Design a protein with these regions (language model features):
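Intrinsically disordered, low-complexity, charged/polar segments
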Residues: 119-120, 155-175
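C-terminal accessory "lid"/substrate-recognition subdomains
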Residues: 1-93, 102-105, 109-119
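Short beta-strand-centered aromatic/proline hotspots
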Residues: 135-143
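Short coil-to-beta transition motif at edge beta-strands of beta-rich domains
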Residues: 119-131
Length: 175
């Protein structure tokens, strides 16, 4: 990291490498994919991300997801203050990035890649969920609290786990 990065006494001047980009699209996101993507973006380009923010529709949630960040600091949460998605309102995602040497197309593609996936399983299906090892479970709910699945593990405790992303790393078809 540049040693002058946090020097508040330094002169600040912006050149033509500093730009902003915004994007809006209809649809809903998987918040777990979003957090993973933002984390990667901060690690790789955080020094050049001066400011970023957005209001997003997350699958399985009525509240709007509001996020903002400065460089490598990121915060995001569901906000009832901003408002809930109203019945019939088009659920959409909007974001703005301000920074140096931004690649608008890559930022758009990164956010679009976080869209909520079409689920492979339905309520009541038997699956194997990864809880450190793959363990037999039953899908209790789809799109619960922003997660693709809530699974009841089929053991004595009947504990519930959320599956953050619908792929074979997290959940597999049962026999």
């Amino acid at each position: 990291m540049d040693p002058e990065f946090l020097d508040t006494e330094a002169e600040h001047e912006h050149d033509d490498r500093v730009t902003s980009t915004s994007y809006k699209f209809a649809g809903e996101l998987n918040v777990n994919k979003l957090q993973s993507w933002i984390g990667k973006l901060m690690r790789e380009q955080g020094e050049d991300l001066f400011r970023y923010k957005g209001v997003l529709a997350v699958k399985g949630m009525d509240a709007k997801y509001v996020f903002q960040g400065v460089h490598m600091l990121f915060g995001g949460d569901f906000s009832e203050e901003i408002g809930l998605w109203k019945k019939g309102e088009q659920r959409e995602c909007r974001f703005v990035f301000i920074g140096r040497d931004l690649d608008p197309e890559a930022l758009q593609q990164g956010l679009v890649a976080c869209q909520a996936e079409t689920l492979r399983f339905k309520r009541g299906d038997t699956v194997y969920a990864n809880i450190g090892e793959f363990t037999k479970g039953k899908i209790l709910k789809c799109w619960d609290q922003g997660n693709p699945y809530r699974v009841e593990i089929q053991n004595e405790e009947k504990s519930n786990v959320w599956v953050p992303i619908d792929n074979d790393n997290y959940v597999r078809k049962g026999v």
